[in-house]
A protein has these predicted regions:
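Sec-exported extracytoplasmic/periplasmic mature domains
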Residues: 46, 65, 76, 128-132, ...
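C-terminal soluble interaction/assembly domains
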Residues: 272-343
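N-terminal mature-domain "stem" immediately C-terminal to a signal peptide or N-terminal signal-anchor/transmembrane
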Residues: 20-89
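C-terminal motif of bacterial Sec signal peptides marking the signal peptidase cleavage site
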Residues: 15-18
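Short acidic/His-enriched helical or mixed secondary-structure segments at domain edges of catalytic enzymes
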Residues: 256-281
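Extracytoplasmic/secreted envelope proteins and their assembly/folding machinery
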Residues: 35-38, 121-124, 225-228, 232, ...
Length: 343
């Protein structure tokens, strides 16, 4: 199968990337979501005295009763914050001491978060516009957790942002052998500030519409993932596609230039689209430096990109379809009625 370089498709791709899902944006300026304020749990935690960690944590729990317990038990993995749980206090103390240099490295970059508050406020307005019944997180909080901890987490009462996941692609600890083993460069290149709001809104989209495609045929997983990308474009109309898809612009251009060849690959691969074999599905859904059996220019997670094209084709044929209606439509229906056949 002959794959093309994206040069001839560049103009089309640029136009597509600029427009994409963003051409019918509503005016959300009048939607009230309140003032978005990011509570600085990170600053408060690393201001504790490590010699009096128990007293400090209890003060912190009084100030942040909606997050401190979740931080200790779930993010640090130390169990409940209780007098009888000495492991929790020791784990918190060790983490504070060992990660203080990390916090000091991040502090200049994230001293102010007003820019992020503005981005989230705009995103929350789009969420409320499309899904008025959804209850937005009442709190937004910044923390610094272990490097294998979440970059974004939705707790019962908050949207929590783990700044350790956004130290910059060239942050020294990401580039160590251990760091690269945990987060290879095709992942850590996205550990930049511009991905924070997109990751937050993607987490909210997943909270509104939990992913139930696990164990389903590959094509259903593809359309499910692609549908999330389509929704991300609606919730973040000013955000480049390269941010919420996780692709580089070059990868998006390559996919656009080779769309028909990519689709033919799936059609010619012995009922691959209907496979439920996890070992097969993981080659096309999920992180990876490239797609198995495709050229080096191909991105990983190519199945999500194809699913995205299928969703866009379906939406273009169903004028007036709302995001809620799309997200409630069975993915097999979306695939079959899209009659997706790229030229």
């Amino acid at each position: 199968m002959n794959y093309r370089t994206p040069l001839l498709a560049l103009l089309i791709a640029v136009t597509f990337i600029r427009c994409g899902n963003h051409d019918e944006r509503p005016d959300v300026s009048g939607i009230n979501v309140g003032d978005i304020h990011i509570d600085r749990f990170d600053t408060a935690f690393f201001g504790l005295d490590s010699n009096h960690i128990a007293a400090g944590l209890y003060r912190l729990d009084h100030e942040y009763p909606w997050f401190t317990g979740a931080f200790v038990s779930d993010i640090l993995g130390a169990g409940p914050l209780a007098d009888s749980n000495h492991v929790a206090f020791e784990a918190a103390r060790q983490f504070l001491v060992s990660y203080l240099p990390i916090r000091d490295s991040l502090e200049p970059r994230y001293r102010r978060l007003d820019w992020l508050e503005r981005q989230l406020q705009t995103g929350f307005r789009y969420v409320k516009y499309y899904f008025p019944r959804y209850k937005l997180p009442p709190k937004v909080v910044a923390f610094i957790g272990p490097f294998d901890g979440p970059g974004v987490a939705l707790t019962t009462y908050s949207l929590a942002i783990g700044l350790q996941s956004y130290a910059g692609r060239n942050f020294s600890l990401y580039l160590t052998p251990k760091g690269q083993d945990m987060y290879p460069q095709y992942i850590s290149r996205r550990f930049e500030p511009e991905y924070i709001a997109a990751n937050c809104l993607s987490a909210i989209a997943g909270d509104i519409f939990p992913d139930s495609s696990d164990g389903r045929p590959l094509i259903e997983e593809m359309v499910t993932k692609g549908r999330y990308w389509w929704l991300a474009g609606r919730l973040m109309p000013d955000t480049p596609d390269s941010i919420y898809t996780g692709y580089t612009k070059a990868q998006l251009d390559w996919c656009t230039a080779n769309e028909s060849q990519i689709w033919n690959f799936f059609l010619q691969s012995n009922d691959l689209l209907y496979s439920v074999d996890p070992d097969q599905i993981k080659n096309y859904i999920g992180e990876g430096p490239k797609t198995l059996a495709m050229p080096d220019g191909s991105p990983g997670n190519i199945g999500a990109w194809v699913g995205w094209q299928i969703v866009k084709k379906y939406v273009s044929d169903h004028h007036g379809l709302t995001p809620l209606q799309l997200m409630q439509t069975p993915v097999r229906t979306i695939f079959e009625e899209s009659k997706y056949k790229p030229r």
